[in-house]
Amino acid sequence: MTTEDTENKNVIFIVLDSLRKDKLSVYDDEVDFTSNIQQFAENSRVYANVTAQAPWTLPSHASIFTGQYPWDHEATHKNTHLDTKRELLAEKFQSEGYETYAITPNAWISKPMGTTKGFEYTENFLGLASYDPVQNIFESLRTRFDSIDRQTRRKIAGFLDGVFNKIGSSDICKSRETVDEVKNTLQKIDEDENFFLFTNLMTAHEPYEVGEPPREYL
């Protein structure tokens, strides 16, 4: 075994929230608009059979961060936060001497949701990273939301999605700001520092409005 094999590797974990497998040329030859992702995949390990553990953000990320199924970590519609007593992926990296970073505009990846434990640096562009008054409001709303029956919760969630869509996806996705912050963070990290950086990009989660150039970054 060489020295290179035993050295710690830096890890960048990128989630393209809600991006469908059948919209990537890596998995479908008829797709012709994801050339950059295709190029990246050609020099990478690609898994052909991967299944998400849940159909929405919180339980899916809770499974990623805990290595558990939703019925084990219990962060679901019934209990809309992750128990902070559980050891999360970022904490494991911390214990190995890694600096840990979470950069995302996703409200489910935030301190009030219990999903950022172990990340020393958190930026989520929604004021939810470390602002205690907002956290208190979020926890209060979450407690009330959890007490409502499932059908009513779905109606509320659908209404809020409609409100966000009226506002405009560009206002809430903040993908450009997220990518810029990731780049700035990487530039600031000392080259001798081992790091784990997690980012979640939300553009595919919202209706896509074609811009100019429409496919520059795909």
Regions found by a protein language model. Give the residues of each.
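Catalytic domains that recognize anionic headgroups
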Residues: 1-218
